[in-house]
Amino acid sequence: MTCSSFGKCGSCVLWEMPYDEQLKMKSEKLKEMFSEFDMPEIEVVHGSDEHFRARAEFRVWHEGDKSYYAMRKRKEDGRGVIPIEECKIVDKAIYDIMTPLLKEIEKNDNLRFKLYEIDFLSNSKGELIITLIYHKKVDESIAEDIKKLKEKFKNADFIVRKKGRKYVFDKNYLIEELNINSKTYKYKIIENTFSQPNRQMNQKMIEWAMRNSEDLKGDLVELYCGNGNFTIPLSERFNKVIATEISKESIEAATYNAEINARDNITFLAMSAAEFSKLYKDRSPLITKYDLKNILIDPPRAGLDDKSREFVNEFDNIIYISCNPETLQRDLKTLAKGREIKAFAFFDQFPYTNHAECGVILKKN
């Protein structure tokens, strides 16, 4: 991939390295990081190195009568942002609309004045949610201007935000479709809630988790379930599933997603990992009806805190999806004791960065 922003933008730090060398470098680094553990060869899973991001956020840079998208500078160039002409890592639907959208905004002082940021969310059908974030007072008068944008960009819905206020034109969600093991799953993805940014890699991660859980017995508990991204396909591998998430909005989406995918063996709970851990330890009637031998965790970058790690360690088998190898390494020092690491995968979610997403399957000896 080539991009006119390479060498200027601080996002794609590995821009000078061919993609196959990036994969080799990252996988070798992971191999060294986890050398203390007895585990199989690291499976390297990757997709396209361009047009892979279904979510993107850009600052807006105004100069005279022109406006530009802006990204943070490279570290060696100091703090701040720089204007960019294009971004080749974003989904094709986002890429195609970026320039024409900004040209329309430039023509309208009401839309342009104190526009601070533009966020994009896309789905596999090329539909978009575009969020305009302002550092000014915004009221209903902006509706006519947004209506004109919607007439121009018929595949997009718009959201206008300023501190404490939000206006939606016409909806704040997309329906995503993922093809997993030749079956289509549908997901409601709500703007400003977490969703996996790399659609292609997300499908491959879910397929990997399903493939490596085929022989697991008992029911499944999932922490940090979000909108049911892993929960819904994996529910086909287990008799019953109980899944928790602290975000009520995400739980509402997950419940809806289970319904539209005709999955009736999942119970979603709007609670933190700590709250669920207490229910489990207190042997709540809500919990005792499950045969909970398996747990799936997809925690934030901080990984598991001490209490969560202690709780997860009570389960026979663990499916751990990690967005931070350093905290994964720390957590495995506890979780790998008395368990065999049956599979370890590196998912290259973000080409041209040092980021490495990992998946680990641990089974009790």
From Swiss-Prot:
It comes from the Bacteria. One of its GO terms (biological process) is methylation. Dual-specificity methyltransferase that catalyzes the formation of 5-methyluridine at position 54 (m5U54) in all tRNAs, and that of position 341 (m5U341) in tmRNA (transfer-mRNA). This is tRNA/tmRNA (uracil-C(5))-methyltransferase. GO terms for molecular function: rRNA binding; tRNA (uracil(54)-C5)-methyltransferase activity, S-adenosyl methionine-dependent; tRNA binding. PANTHER family: TRNA/TMRNA (URACIL-C(5))-METHYLTRANSFERASE (PTHR47790), TRNA_TMRNA (URACIL-C(5))-METHYLTRANSFERASE (PTHR47790:SF2). Belongs to the class I-like SAM-binding methyltransferase superfamily. RNA M5U methyltransferase family. TrmA subfamily. Keywords: Methyltransferase, S-adenosyl-L-methionine, Transferase, tRNA processing. Pfam families: tRNA_U5-meth_tr. InterPro entries: MeTrfase_TrmA_AS, SAM-dependent_MTases_sf, TrmA_MeTrfase, U5_MeTrfase_fam. Its EC number is 2.1.1.-, 2.1.1.35. The active site is at 323 (nucleophile), 357 (proton acceptor). It catalyses: uridine(54) in tRNA + S-adenosyl-L-methionine = 5-methyluridine(54) in tRNA + S-adenosyl-L-homocysteine + H(+); uridine(341) in tmRNA + S-adenosyl-L-methionine = 5-methyluridine(341) in tmRNA + S-adenosyl-L-homocysteine + H(+). One of its GO terms (cellular component) is cytosol. S-adenosyl-L-methionine binds at residues 196, 224, 229, 245, 298. The keyword Methyltransferase applies.
